[in-house]
Curated annotation (Swiss-Prot):
GO CC annotation: cytoplasm
Superkingdom: Bacteria
Name of protein: Thiamine-phosphate synthase
Record-linked InterPro entries: Aldolase_TIM, ThiamineP_synth_sf, ThiamineP_synth_TenI, TMP_synthase
């Protein structure tokens, strides 16, 4: 049963781009996307705070679900919609502070053991990856593939789930067919020849998410 220890999110979050700049956040919100993540890596809090503030303000303006990757203190300080954490960040993060601030929490997983760890934290949603080989980041684990993804989705039947990792426009329909509630994409949009067209096509496949 879906009983998160953090504020809930819609069962289907729809298309979920993960981007590294405020410029991309603004473009995608203007294009109709309503679930996004700002992921800026390996910088100090003071170096990213202005971007976090600007992204959160844009999210509010568009009534969108904006998650901040990793920088949970800034997300709390500026009241983001939510925070997304990798497995490696869970132990170093004050989950009680995130919960007390009323922020949603998403957690990355790569196998059954990590799903168990995520479930113990009772987050708002669980991300399942990486589905396919990806060039976006170095991954210590092997790609899950569609069959494994479907098995995880079945196990987490009443939990909001997000598939991530190597999901292209061509692969997106098969990913959605597993029953997963959302697809997170990076290069499928940011490296597309026509990002507006790619975004529109992905929205047709994955939707904007439930209200």
């Amino acid at each position: 049963m879906y009983q998160p220890d953090f504020p809930p999110v819609p069962f289907r979050l729809g298309l979920y781009p993960v981007v590294d700049s405020v410029q991309w956040i603004e473009r995608l919100l203007d294009a109709g996307v309503r679930t996004l993540q700002l992921r800026i890596k390996d910088r100090r809090d003071e170096e990213v705070e202005a971007d976090v503030v600007a992204a959160i303000a844009l999210g509010r303006r568009y009534n969108a679900r904006l998650f901040i990757n990793d920088y949970w203190r800034l997300a709390i300080k500026h009241q983001a919609y939510g925070v997304h954490l990798g497995q490696e960040d869970l132990q170093a993060t004050d989950l009680n502070a995130i919960r007390a601030a009323g922020l949603r929490l998403g957690v990355s997983t790569h196998d059954d053991m990590e799903i168990d760890v995520a479930l113990a934290a009772r987050p708002s949603y669980i991300a399942l990856g990486h589905v396919f080989p990806t060039q976006t980041k170095q991954m210590p684990s092997a790609p899950q593939g569609l069959e494994q993804l479907a098995r995880h989705v079945e196990r987490l039947a009443d939990y909001p789930t997000v598939a991530i990792g190597g999901i292209s426009l061509a692969r997106a329909p098969a990913v959605i067919a597993t029953g997963v509630g959302s697809i997170a994409v990076v290069s499928a949009i940011t490296q597309a020849a026509d990002w507006r067209l790619a975004t529109a096509q992905l929205l047709e496949i994955a939707g904007v998410g439930d209200e």
